[in-house]
Amino acid sequence: MNRREFMIMGAAGAAMAGRNSLYAAANAGVQPRSDRGIVKRAAPPRNPRPYTGLDWSKVVKVKTTSHGHCMSQWWLEQYLKRGFGLITMSNYYPSAPWCPAAKMTENYYRLHHEHAVMVNGIRKDGPFDWNKIIEPWKHTLDPAAAAKKPAWAAKYPFVEGKKIFKPLPPGVLEAPNAEHHSFRLENGKWAGNLHICSPGSTFASGTFDAHNLSKTFSHGYHYGSGEFWGTAIDRMIEGMLYEDGGGVTINHPSWTKLDRELMLRMLDHDPRVLGIEVIEDSGYNSENYWDWALSTGRQCFGFFVPDWHVENKVFGVNVLCVQEKTVHACLKAYRDGNFYGALNGLDELAFTRIAFDGKTVVAATDKPARFEIITARGVVKEVKGNEVSWTVEKEAYWQGPGYHIFARVKAYAVDGSKEVLFSQPFMLKS
């Protein structure tokens, strides 16, 4: 399954909505925004100074990603080969956690669908017995259409199959996550290019039938969220395992050409919307989105992901910096911004220190590197070696307040490995 196919087949929402009158009729009269049933919990702002209080001499580095699909044992092995210590599979159809991995079987969510779904524009709680639901229209199912998409098809009636994964190796942690899609905008229109992950949340949305092979979409069962994006985010937050850990990520803004104002509205919606993907689908680089958001004065953490492309060297890895290796500590590292990004994540280069004391940004690596300090003004310092420091300049009168706004560190390997590291940003005026 590739993303181009995903968009063409209508799983992004807007395209299918435009050419499917039945779908439009099923959703007529839906209120654009509805926060009913959501209990909002207060949360502090996103941390303006990540890594504060970390004892780098005792830091345990846990490799993971916030957005990586994992559909079989082969996929899982790609993460394990790269040394992942935390698995947070972000699968969809439905957008539901594959956690614990030990429970997952072939056809699992066709037989064990417990979460709510939007049905004819109304949110209905589970469980859903799909064999029983589909039975009245089973004679309309098209085997030829299913044969064209074997990865997403299953013979009706559905039967639970074998386990998908072998047991995780000792010491490898796992936490819930999923990739959610098909949201409404504030005006009720579809945000076809908006995808969201929520590492640490048990929230689930949508159905197994994104390609309508079982005709559930034709009968009013929405394959994705189907709700206003803000309501869906609130549900993700409501499902967090820990109040102080995990969060929401805005996926592949460059690949989907995400509207920048929508990105800002999402960051403003709740501080647990942690940030955006920087290294994303197929190795796309979204540093332009990242620096633009940061230049508005908003803290915005950067995430580094393989998405579907686990066979590439350019992978996208989040390196969590924790004092103890537990699920809670790992998810709290996400919330606090105590992690950095790696382009490859093959241990070819690592940060050994990143800090900001309010005046000076410092960073160090385990091997020589080429460092860049990046602010709202661009690259303000470049140096080679094992460490870098940059003291915030006293602003000249012609520059005005908040001239630099933020600072982040980027480190390039100089040994030919092509590894690149990305610190989280420091907001210079918290």
State the predicted function of each range.
Residues E5-N27:
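N-terminal export signals
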Residues A43-G245, N251, I279-W290, V305-W308, ...:
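A metal-dependent hydrolase metal-coordination microenvironment
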Residues S21-Y23, S214, A293:
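Surface-exposed flexible segments
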